[in-house]
Amino acid sequence: MIVNFISALGKQVIDFFRALGRAGFMLFGALIGKPQIRKHFPLLVKQMHVLGVQSLLIILLSGLFIGMVLGLQGYVVLIDFSAETSLGQLVALSLLRELGPVVTALLFAGRAGSALTAEIGLMKATEQLSSLEMMAVDPLRRVIAPRFWAGVISMPVLSILFIAIGIWGGSLVGVDWKGVDSGSFWSVMQNSVSWSYDILNGFIKAVFFAVAVTWIALFNGYDCMPTSEGISQATTRTVVHASLVVLGLDFILTAIMFGAG
């Protein structure tokens, strides 16, 4: 019983490091080499539209509602201490430090990450990647690299938009509905938010999350079994693994950025 458990655990650990190694080689092969800006730039722009622009609606709506909920819940708590003028600070710091990057990454993993995995998996199942190799075209450079950079560029921008619309949603509830003084709301927020400590750290988080989510999505599609069942399982793995990595990475980055303060 114990031997079987140890054997199974060891196999899982070995499989994990094998997959990590394959993912590293895939990313290395996609990014290292002579850049071909003229060939790859149109592909990059197309993928930025697919991953970024087509994700705008869910990002903006989610940011608006989360900002409104923050404004309402924050007002209910702060009014008991006659500190409702600090509502802008609460909403802004919550979105900049945590909710903006994290929720955007989770939504990006569910919408764009799963689509990436399914697309790459389908290309593998229909032997499109093999056909590129037969034509002396590197599929890593042609297929993986533009999608990777599109994800890394798009997700931080989506995070900025999420935060902006969330702050506006918080002001709608706090200022326009609950009657918090507009000048106090915005001035306290401006005085409490630090460019280097809050805004920059939140953006760095978004970049780390973008790399992790896009990398996981592309690898699961590139490494999946070329069958309908394999693609389905890979898509599920992308959402689960990316979400867990984002939450774990968020704790590590938060401890590094804000834990010493």
From Swiss-Prot:
One example of a Gene Ontology biological process annotation: phospholipid transport
Entry GO MF terms: phospholipid transporter activity
Annotated TM spans: 13-33, 50-70, 148-168, 199-219, 239-259
Cytoplasmic side stretches: 1-12, 71-147, 220-238
Protein name per the record: Intermembrane phospholipid transport system permease protein MlaE
Keywords on record: Cell inner membrane, Cell membrane, Membrane, Transmembrane, Transmembrane helix, Transport
Subunit composition and interactions: The complex is composed of two ATP-binding proteins (MlaF), two transmembrane proteins (MlaE), two cytoplasmic solute-binding proteins (MlaB) and six periplasmic solute-binding proteins (MlaD).
GO CC term (a single one): ATP-binding cassette (ABC) transporter complex
Function: Part of the ABC transporter complex MlaFEDB, which is involved in a phospholipid transport pathway that maintains lipid asymmetry in the outer membrane by retrograde trafficking of phospholipids from the outer membrane to the inner membrane. Probably responsible for the translocation of the substrate across the membrane.
Topology versus the membrane: Multi-pass membrane protein
Record-stated family: Belongs to the MlaE permease family.
Residues on Periplasmic side: 34-49, 169-198, 260-261
Localization of this protein: Cell inner membrane
Matching InterPro entries: ABC_MlaE_roteobac, MlaE_Permease, Permease_MalE
Keyword Heme: no
